[in-house]
From Swiss-Prot:
Its main location: cytoplasm. It holds the Pfam family CsrA. This is Translational regulator CsrA. A translational regulator that binds mRNA to regulate translation initiation and/or mRNA stability. Usually binds in the 5'-UTR at or near the Shine-Dalgarno sequence preventing ribosome-binding, thus repressing translation. Its main target seems to be the major flagellin gene, while its function is anatagonized by FliW.
Amino acid sequence: MLVLSRKSNESIQIGDNIEISIISIDGDQVKLGINAPRHIDIHRKEVYLAIQQENSEAAKTVPLSQLKGLLNQQG
């Protein structure tokens, strides 16, 4: 892992099109600004992990008999 030190109002450039700026530092809270192309998803780590978990749950296979039971309940 690359570790860089930055002060308020300084930036880090990633590749040609991603810039991370230090907006402010207040105690143990750091506010970041991120400029990146719209096609790049940017999430807090805990949100990203929750999305991955939900996607994993949604991708699980369900036995056909269970699906038929659900359809019968609907109709």
